[in-house]
UniProtKB/Swiss-Prot annotation:
A single GO molecular function term of this UniProt record: germacrene A hydroxylase activity
GN (gene name): GAO1
Pathway this chain belongs to: Secondary metabolite biosynthesis; terpenoid biosynthesis
Reaction equations catalysed: (+)-(R)-germacrene A + 3 reduced [NADPH--hemoprotein reductase] + 3 O2 = germacra-1(10),4,11(13)-trien-12-oate + 3 oxidized [NADPH--hemoprotein reductase] + 4 H2O + 4 H(+)
Presence of keyword RNA-binding: no
Main location: endoplasmic reticulum
InterPro entries reported in the protein's UniProt record: Cyt_P450, Cyt_P450_CS, Cyt_P450_E_grp-I, Cyt_P450_sf
PROSITE patterns to which the protein is assigned, alphabetical: CYTOCHROME_P450
Name assigned to this protein: Germacrene A hydroxylase
Topological domains, Lumenal: 24-488
Keywords in alphabetical order: Endoplasmic reticulum, Glycoprotein, Heme, Iron, Membrane, Metal-binding, Monooxygenase, Oxidoreductase, Signal-anchor, Transmembrane, Transmembrane helix
Positions annotated as glycosylated: 169, 260, 379
Length: 488
């Protein structure tokens, strides 16, 4: 049977392509280890059907803790060990201080003018200074203490009013509580469109997880439209922008001292000053950072902590005994009551080890060509630091997959990124600037939930039947909502 002209041309094209591939001159440069790759998509086929942080960890265990990934058009290096994390985030920190441009950052984050995604440069340095001295200083975080205490008590009352023995959707309750805390910290009060604002933030977070086609083929603009990503993000941004505009328009700037300023007060003061002029869009981008990133990371950490404690009755009993002995029947918990509770803090540290809010941190980008241990790294190469893999490295952590809070009893590891085998908030110039606020929004809610109530799974299920499946978005959440039965 004769071949059609079309088939003949197709076969000839394939043969020519394979010939060119086979006869292509081999590079004399030292190449980073990598898995087998395919044309066009690179290594993406290795990550299909996996949680990205777990898939990348599995590849690193086969090919090395410093390896190369080709994600579509994007050349990427992956760091999966404390040794390489320390080398890159200290010696080469400024070289990899940029952020890769993304479609989400362009549309949602007002052209990458928020704190998280802003490119490295003078604008970002001013934002970082603003966070350190004003928005996220220890003093400013402390000033929101009464808000945290009030909203935690509101959650306790809500659970008690629902009645003992009835299942509670803790996922929803925790997310709503922390969203309200951050709304009051940002705007001085809960906003009237709180539920709509929260739902929009949740949708943004769902859109930012994983490896998106728009970001792995950035030059193929038609894919941004074919995938529907640009249209979805544009629609979300329009709703978000209208809501934030209304919030800002209705906001009454505080006339009291700086100590009592809300986050929006600070931003509006600076917007109208020559000290650090901000545009209206800059203000909105920063507010979205404070609310979106803060709500998702803190609520996920509280959920994972409770989930791990449910599966580990010994640890649950120990942390509840510590709380109840220290508080001795006190009704409302104040932050001073729990600052020195050792085991509660061990539980939080171990939760952050197993479930870092951003397991792949936020990707960085190389600002200039660099020689890294003999490997030539090109400008614009993407950097992924897999803190999920680092935090579970069996070379540094005994029984690395197990929940054992006691491992930190005599462990001086610094939670703020000084020790590179434990990086819950990243490290270096681009580490999470909101770590202090995030920890405050974890410690008090967790203490209240554990102090006031005993918890069990619905329908008589045993503790080891709790589903711990992950869902990957902007942060790694539980795939199923945490439904538990309180008793008090």
């Amino acid at each position: 049977m004769e071949l059609s002209i079309t088939t003949s041309i197709a076969l000839a094209t394939i043969v020519f392509f394979l010939y060119k591939l086979a006869t292509r001159p081999k590079s004399t440069k030292k190449q980073l280890p990598e898995a087998s790759r395919l044309p066009i998509i690179g290594h993406m086929h290795h990550l299909i059907g996996t949680m990205p942080h777990r898939g990348v960890m599995d590849l690193a265990r086969k090919h090395g803790s410093l390896m190369h990934l080709q994600l579509g058009e994007v050349s990427t290096i992956v760091v999966s060990s404390p040794k390489w994390a320390k080398e890159i985030l200290t010696t080469y920190d400024i070289t990899f201080a940029n952020r890769p441009e993304t479609l989400t950052g362009e549309i949602i984050a007002y052209h990458n003018t928020d704190i998280v995604l802003a490119p490295y440069g003078e604008y970002w340095r001013q934002l970082r200074k603003l966070c350190t001295l004003e928005l996220l200083s220890v003093k400013k975080v402390k000033s929101f203490q009464s808000i945290r205490e009030e909203e935690c008590w509101n959650l306790v009352k809500e659970v008690k009013e629902s009645g003992s023995g009835k299942p509670i959707n803790l996922s929803e309750s925790i997310f709503t509580m922390i969203a309200t805390i951050l709304s009051r910290a940002a705007f001085g009060k809960g906003i009237k469109d709180q539920r709509e604002f929260t739902e929009i933030v949740k949708e943004i977070l769902r859109q930012t997880g994983g490896f998106d086609v728009a970001d792995i083929f950035p030059s193929k603009k038609f894919l941004h439209h074919l995938s529907g990503k640009r249209a979805r993000l544009t629609s979300i941004h329009k709703k978000l922008d209208n809501l934030i505009n209304n919030i800002v328009a209705e906001h009454h700037v505080s006339t009291s001292s700086k100590a009592n300023e809300t986050l929006l007060d600070v931003l509006l003061r600076l917007k109208d000053s020559a000290e650090f002029p901000l545009t209206a869009d800059n203000v909105k981008a920063i507010i979205l950072d404070m609310f979106g990133a803060g709500t998702d990371t803190s609520s996920a950490t509280v959920e994972w902590a409770i989930s791990e404690l449910i599966r580990c009755p010994r640890a649950m009993e120990k942390v509840q005994a510590e709380l109840r002995q220290a508080l001795n029947g006190k009704e409302k918990i104040q932050e001073e009551d729990i600052q020195d509770l050792a085991y509660l803090n061990l539980v939080i540290r171990e939760t952050l080890r197993l479930h870092p809010p951003l397991p792949l941190v936020m990707p960085r980008e190389c600002r200039e060509p660099v020689n890294l241990a003999g490997y030539e790294i090109a400008n614009k190469t993407k950097l992924i630091v897999n803190v999920f893999a680092i935090n579970r490295d069996p070379e540094y952590w005994k029984d690395a997959e197990a929940f054992i809070p006691e491992r930190f009893e005599n462990n001086p590891n610094n939670i703020m990124g000084a020790d590179y085998e434990y990086l819950p908030f990243g490290a270096g110039r681009r580490m999470c600037p909101g770590a202090a606020l995030g920890l405050a929004n974890v410690q008090l809610p967790l203490a209240n939930i554990l102090y006031h109530f005993n918890w069990k799974l619905p329908n008589g299920a045993s503790h080891d039947q709790l589903d711990m499946t992950e869902s990957f978005g902007a942060t790694v959440q539980r795939k199923t909502e945490l439904l538990l039965v309180p008793s008090f």
